[in-house]
């Protein structure tokens, strides 16, 4: 019984020390931390937005070979299942690479 009371007291002390609400947890005094779209769009200028879109298009055009192989494998269900077990490289080699001796 004494150990149960001691355990309850230790648990209560742990709750008090760990759940203490300090001033640091109240750093933001705003009631609503979210902003509307108009104010959110003022952070990035239209020029930066345009530049980001252009860079994204360039990245889409010049994808690495392994990513193109993975996308090809994702479109074919058997290849995708095989890839879940053996990996995308092995699956692509099995289903899409030309076999030796065939033209």
UniProtKB/Swiss-Prot annotation:
Keywords: Chondrogenesis, Deafness, Developmental protein, Differentiation, Disulfide bond, Gamma-carboxyglutamic acid, Osteogenesis, Phosphoprotein, Secreted, Signal. The keyword Acyltransferase does not apply. GO terms for biological process: cartilage condensation; cell differentiation; ossification; regulation of bone mineralization. The modification Phosphoserine is found at residues 22, 25, 28. InterPro entries: GLA-like_dom_SF, GLA_domain, MGP, Osteocalcin/MGP. The modification 4-carboxyglutamate is found at residues 21, 56, 60, 67, 71. Residues 51-97 form the Gla domain. PROSITE patterns: GLA_1, GLA_2. Requires vitamin K-dependent gamma-carboxylation for its function. Residues 97-103 form a propeptide. Associates with the organic matrix of bone and cartilage. Thought to act as an inhibitor of bone formation. This is Matrix Gla protein. It comes from Homo sapiens (Human).
């Amino acid at each position: 019984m004494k150990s149960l009371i001691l355990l309850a007291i230790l648990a209560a002390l742990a709750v008090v020390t760990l759940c203490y609400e300090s001033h640091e947890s109240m750093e933001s005094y705003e009631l609503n931390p979210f902003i509307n779209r108009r104010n959110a769009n003022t952070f990035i200028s239209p020029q930066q937005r345009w530049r980001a879109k252009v860079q994204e298009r360039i990245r889409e055009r010049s994808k690495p070979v392994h990513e193109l192989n993975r996308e090809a494998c994702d479109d074919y269900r058997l290849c995708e299942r095989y890839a879940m077990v053996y990996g995308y490289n092995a699956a692509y080699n099995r289903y899409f690479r030309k076999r030796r001796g065939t033209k």
